[in-house]
């Protein structure tokens, strides 16, 4: 009973999740017009400046209607950990709440949401891309060099892990690269869940084929809106390459490879669509196992009413 009472006393926050191309932005703007909400973006691609078309970043008109926080905060050469998102989102949520308004968190990066609702796990889950990058470095420089890198990052773990133990050495480095914190530091501290009463919603079409059609339609709009020129401009920079998190965003890698002559235009389009469908599939897999989640159909006329009713927030 005490936990329930405590929950009721926490400030409200709305989570609006969903796969890519499901209609999150349109509904979020409607919510901002009906409720005293302010949007915080929960999207690992929208954080990057100069990556507007391929990420389907909200338009200037949409941003004028409903400003989004945590958009355009980093240069594409920079990386951004889940821990950094959690820190920035909590600061934004506190600012919004202190002004008597409601944080509305909108996006499709599920690890970001989990960091808020469940707290940051003591040790992050394995990331095959980060692991592959570490193994590539090991092939080039040797595990001894990576062990020396670990000594600089986490001397306690380096003392415990032998240079000839690639599995544990790789994991310790992976944890640091994902979270920005050492294994030793994370083992000592676990951040609790964010102190908010969350109302959690997911929006998606009821039919997977409709979602795929929406993905294709949106991808073609991007191609016709200057996406190729956007990537040409990014590619012209000497400091950007395909191993960066920003350039691993769906669509960008495929366009980059097309510009390098690795495939023809139609193949680039097909690979970009396949990567986007895979992203949507992963997002939906996360959401199907999500606890206390209210589902909304993309095409329902009652989504705004249902969010207002189920979140029990009064205007």
From Swiss-Prot:
Q: Has the keyword tRNA processing been applied to this entry?
A: yes
* Species the sequence originates in: Pseudoalteromonas atlantica (strain T6c / ATCC BAA-1087)
Cofactor(s) needed for function: Mg(2+)
Site, as annotated: Interaction with substrate tRNA: 109, 131
Chain coiled-coil ranges: none
Q: One MF term in GO for this entry?
A: tRNA dimethylallyltransferase activity
Please give one Pfam family short name: IPPT
Superkingdom of source: Bacteria
NCBIfam families named in the record: miaA
Q: How does it assemble?
A: Monomer.
**Physiological role:** Catalyzes the transfer of a dimethylallyl group onto the adenine at position 37 in tRNAs that read codons beginning with uridine, leading to the formation of N6-(dimethylallyl)adenosine (i(6)A).
Region feature Interaction with substrate tRNA, mapped onto this chain: 43-46, 167-171, 248-253
Give the reaction(s) catalysed: adenosine(37) in tRNA + dimethylallyl diphosphate = N(6)-dimethylallyladenosine(37) in tRNA + diphosphate
Q: Any idea of its EC number?
A: 2.5.1.75
- Enumerate the residues binding ATP: 18-25
**GO biological process per UniProt:** tRNA modification
Sites binding substrate sit at: 20-25
Family according to the record: Belongs to the IPP transferase family.
Keywords, in A-Z order = ATP-binding, Magnesium, Nucleotide-binding, Transferase, tRNA processing
Q: What is this protein called?
A: tRNA dimethylallyltransferase
């Amino acid at each position: 009973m005490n936990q329930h009472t405590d929950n009721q006393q926490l400030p409200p926050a709305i989570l609006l999740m969903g796969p890519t191309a499901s209609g999150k932005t349109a509904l979020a703007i409607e919510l901002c017009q009906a409720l005293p909400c302010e949007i915080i973006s929960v999207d690992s691609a929208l954080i990057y400046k100069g990556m507007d078309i391929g990420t389907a970043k909200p338009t200037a008109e949409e941003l004028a209607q409903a400003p989004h926080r945590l958009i355009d905060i980093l240069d594409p050469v920079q990386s951004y950990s889940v821990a950094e998102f959690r820190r920035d989102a909590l600061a934004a949520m506190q600012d919004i709440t202190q002004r008597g308004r409601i944080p509305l968190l909108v996006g499709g990066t599920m690890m970001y949401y989990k960091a808020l609702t469940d707290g940051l796990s003591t040790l992050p889950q394995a990331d095959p891309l980060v692991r592959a990058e570490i193994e590539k470095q090991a092939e080039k420089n040797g595990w001894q060099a990576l062990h020396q890198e670990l000594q600089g990052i986490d001397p306690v773990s380096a003392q415990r892990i032998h240079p000839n133990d690639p599995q544990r050495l790789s994991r310790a480095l992976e944890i640091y690269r994902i979270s920005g914190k050492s294994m030793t530091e994370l083992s000592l501290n676990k951040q609790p869940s964010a102190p908010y009463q969350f109302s959690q919603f997911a929006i998606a079409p009821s039919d997977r084929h409709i979602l795929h059609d929406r993905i294709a339609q949106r991808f073609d709009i991007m191609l016709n809106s200057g996406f190729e020129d956007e990537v040409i401009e990014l590619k012209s920079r000497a400091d950007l390459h395909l191993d960066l998190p920003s350039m691993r965003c769906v669509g960008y890698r495929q366009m980059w490879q097309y510009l390098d002559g690795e495939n023809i235009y139609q193949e680039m389009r097909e690979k970009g669509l396949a990567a986007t469908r895979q992203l949507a599939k992963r997002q939906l897999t996360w959401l199907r196992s999500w606890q206390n989640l209210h589902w909304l159909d993309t095409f329902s006329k009652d989504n705004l009413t249902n969010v207002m009713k189920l979140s029990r927030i009064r205007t």
